[in-house]
């Protein structure tokens, strides 16, 4: 599991702690999004973030970054990070198995958004979902950008917490990102990533 390959197997042996199988036939099955999407979002209330992780995993996110942002109501100290990561990873693993994913998305925590700037070279596209763009009626940037996505492209999508992204945080990526609105309505922090993933799935999987 987690190498994006599916095999028809025959059980060869079962013990108390493992199952040995013989590989019989490789299966032509792919349940992964054509593009690699990392969801970077500000910390939000625990139940909402866990729901986001579950649903975004079902919708095809490849990895998650939880970030303590300027307007995050929830704060996470170092003593709690390890236990939180363990719980989040368990939720992600269960959602991946339930939705027949071929990979288990990863998750990490960063104490501020500046640390993400050091990783921008890892991505082909960086998109920032900004509610002010929606208020101003911006409707085309997201559509135009996702139409450019090619198979295996790596996409980083950044979402704010309940209070949204600050102008300072937006400015960190001013020269490297595309700021997008997600339709004419203002979405909740836990809903916006799901909207984006659904749009990507529709464009790259259903429209082909």
What are the language-model segments listed below?
Residues 4-6, 16-18, 32-36, 59, ...:
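Short connector loops at helix/strand junctions that flank enzyme active sites
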Residues 14-18, 28-31, 78-79, 118-125, ...:
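Short, glycine- and charge-enriched coil/turn segments that flank and shape catalytic ligand pockets
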Residues 1-28:
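N-terminal positively charged helical leader segments and presequences
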Residues 28-128:
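RNA substrate-binding interface of SAM-dependent RNA methyltransferases
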Residues 166-208:
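Structured adenosyl-cofactor binding patch, chiefly the S-adenosyl-L-methionine
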Residues 126-164, 168-170, 177-181:
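Active-site/ligand-binding-proximal alpha/beta "capping" segment
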Residues 2, 43, 110, 130-132, ...:
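Fold-independent oxyanion-binding glycine-rich loops
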Residues 73-74, 136, 189, 196:
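Generic structural signal for helix capping and beta-alpha/helix-loop junctions
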């Amino acid at each position: 599991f987690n190498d994006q390959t599916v095999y028809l197997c025959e059980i060869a042996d079962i013990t108390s702690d493992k199952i040995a199988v013989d590989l019989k036939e490789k299966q032509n099955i792919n349940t992964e999004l054509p593009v690699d999407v990392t969801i970077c979002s500000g910390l939000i209330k625990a139940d909402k973030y866990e729901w986001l992780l579950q649903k975004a995993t079902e919708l095809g996110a490849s990895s998650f970054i939880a970030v303590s942002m300027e307007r995050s109501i929830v704060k996470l100290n170092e003593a709690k990070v390890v236990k939180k990561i363990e719980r989040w990873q368990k939720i992600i693993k269960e959602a991946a198995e339930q939705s027949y994913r071929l990979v288990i998305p990863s998750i990490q925590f960063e104490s501020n958004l500046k640390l993400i700037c050091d990783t921008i070279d890892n991505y082909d596209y960086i998109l920032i979902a900004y509610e002010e763009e929606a208020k101003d009626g911006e409707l085309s940037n997201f559509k135009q950008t996702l139409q450019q996505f090619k198979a295996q492209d790596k996409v980083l999508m950044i979402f704010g917490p309940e209070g949204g992204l600050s102008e300072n945080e937006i400015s960190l990526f001013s020269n490297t990102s595309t700021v997008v609105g997600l339709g004419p309505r203002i979405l909740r922090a836990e809903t916006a990533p799901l909207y984006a993933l659904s749009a990507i799935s529709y464009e790259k999987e259903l429209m082909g």
